Amino acid sequence: MGQEVSSVNNTKNEHHKTNKKSLKGGNERHEMKESSVGISKKIVENSFNNSKLRPGMFIQNSNVVFNEQYKGIKILGKGSFGEVILSRDKHTGHEYAIKVISKKHVKRKTDKESLLREVELLKMLDHINIMKLYEFFEDNNYYYLVSDVYTGGELFDEIISRKRFYEIDAARIIKQILSGITYMHKNNVVHRDLKPENILLETKNKEDMIIKIIDFGLSTHFEYSKKMKDKIGTAYYIAPDVLHGTYDEKCDIWSCGVILYILLSGCPPFNGSNEYDILKKVEAGKYTFDLPQFKKISDKAKDLIKKMLMYTSAVRISARDALEHEWIKMMTSKDNLNIDIPSLELSIANIRQFQSTQKLAQAALLYMGSKLTTIDETKELTKIFKKMDKNGDGQLDRNELIIGYKELLKLKGEDTSDLDNAAIEYEVDQILNSIDLDQNGYIEYSEFLTVSIDRKLLLSTERLEKAFKLFDKDGSGKISANELAQLFGLSDVSSECWKTVLKEVDQNNDGEIDFKEFRDMLVKLCNY
């Protein structure tokens, strides 16, 4: 450059050339900047649209104040760490069981870790037979865990009341427990404290007898290639391999075997006058069917117990194989779910019309479907889901959807004889692509509820307002780019990029979403 401008006579011309070069370079930089912004927008748009939605993403340690959000009605139970209070949501009128844990009793680091681990596990688990966590928050003195109200009491109390169960009832209960455990093990979660006290009955209805697995304080993630070593559990139900300090997820199956033995006989297989005696018998692993109660129990039922109580974990039956056991299939094959046809017709219509690529709308609907519905409102849909869930693992795969969809169409009265398999498979694939919100290849329970529930019921003003408040973290009356970024785990993305992503929802182009825009988005999606 110095050589080019060495002559005074050339200075003007060269200065002109230099300015042209600078201008050209500036344009290039400007174009590069625009290109970079465009790429960033495309990246966030792709990241946003490919976000995996699960109900657990809505459970955050929020700034809810108990007395502002809920009205305590009565104490349902007390424990060493706190109490469970029947409470009513002041905005929706829904009732919940809220576990209130005093921070005075959670001073040890291990206790707090156990509580937070339980919350994290419940956030990721989505199954009919596993306790549903709606909300988790804290104040200076307490932790609060908000869940459904289960009015049927503990399975333990039902055993005490009945003494023992008929085989068909025992099979229905153990099938549900195994369904929950199959789902947990598939998601690399082991419970480690299965017992009748940790299994609740959803309602007092003795015919349906829907169970819920609770208390995940001792639960943890596991790896199939690694053994666990912590010696934890309850004496009657603990597996011998846990006592030996080297075990895997099949410790849960041993506990299921003990529970089934108790359901059929009314007494535990490993008994003793104190905990030491019980543990010695567990360690020996010897039990007997030589009891009067077992004289009328079928060999097939005993066979399942034997396979569950195999001393060596490597040869112990898995949860999935136990679900497929001949005795369970035989005992539950004639279960009649008595599906309400109008509810069936409405759910099929809703599933067929659900087509959305708008991620925010999907997230809002998933929150409303999974967190703002009651047991009574979803009772018929639960029956439909269970009818479609052929292998009982609490998820619907493609094959189950194809078979179940045909059955439901027949129940609804449609003639499926003219529909070829290719047409049904195409429709099922469309459904799977639309409602598999976490993109794992299965339809989870909450996903099914979200797309099949009555839209008029779901989109009530009270529920819309509560859903809006979930996204509007600061209570400003508008959902900002930053609030969405936090919810979707994309906090490092600029607000300009979010405006591009949200342009189809943001009607007034202010870069935020107000309640009217939020409501219109959902109404448009649901054709309501």
UniProtKB/Swiss-Prot annotation:
Activity under varying temperature: Optimum temperature is 20-30 degrees Celsius (at pH 7.6).
List of residues binding Ca(2+) 2: 436, 438, 440, 442, 447
One Pfam family in the UniProt entry: EF-hand_7
Protein kinase domain location: 71-329
pH and activity: Optimum pH is 7.5-8 (at 20 degrees Celsius).
Compositionally biased residues, Basic residues: 14-23
Induction trigger: Induced by xanthurenic acid (XA) and human serum.
Binding site for ATP: 76-84, 99
Tree of life domain: Eukaryota
Effect of residue 360 to A: Partial loss of catalytic activity in presence of calcium
Enzyme Commission number, as recorded: 2.7.11.1
PTM notes: Myristoylated; myristoylation may target it to different subcellular compartments. During male gametogenesis, myristoylation is required to initiate DNA replication but not for mitotic spindle assembly or axoneme activation. Not palmitoylated.
Mutant phenotype after disruption: Replication in host erythrocytes is normal.
Free-text activity regulation comment from the record: Activated by calcium. Upon calcium binding to the EF-hand domains, the C-terminus of the junction domain (J domain) undergoes a conformational change which results in the dissociation of the pseudo-substrate inhibitory motif from the catalytic domain. This, in turn, may facilitate the autophosphorylation of the activation loop at Thr-234, which leads to the kinase activation. Intracellular calcium increase is triggered by xanthurenic acid (XA), a small mosquito molecule that induces the differentiation of specialized transmission stages, the gametocytes, into male and female gametes.
Main location: cytoplasm
Subunit structure: May interact with the pre-replication MCM complex prior male gametogenesis activation.
Reported function: Calcium-dependent protein kinase which acts as a sensor and effector of intracellular Ca(2+) levels probably in part downstream of cGMP-activated PKG kinase. Plays a central role in the host erythrocytes and hepatocytes infection cycles, sexual reproduction and mosquito transmission of the parasite. During the liver stage, involved in sporozoite motility and thus in sporozoite invasion of host hepatocytes, probably together with CDPK1 and CDPK5. Involved in merosome egress from host hepatocytes, probably together with CDPK5.
Protein's UniProt name: Calcium-dependent protein kinase 4
Species, as recorded: Plasmodium falciparum (isolate 3D7)
Lineage, uppermost ranks: Eukaryota, Sar, Alveolata, Apicomplexa, Aconoidasida
Gene for this chain: CDPK4
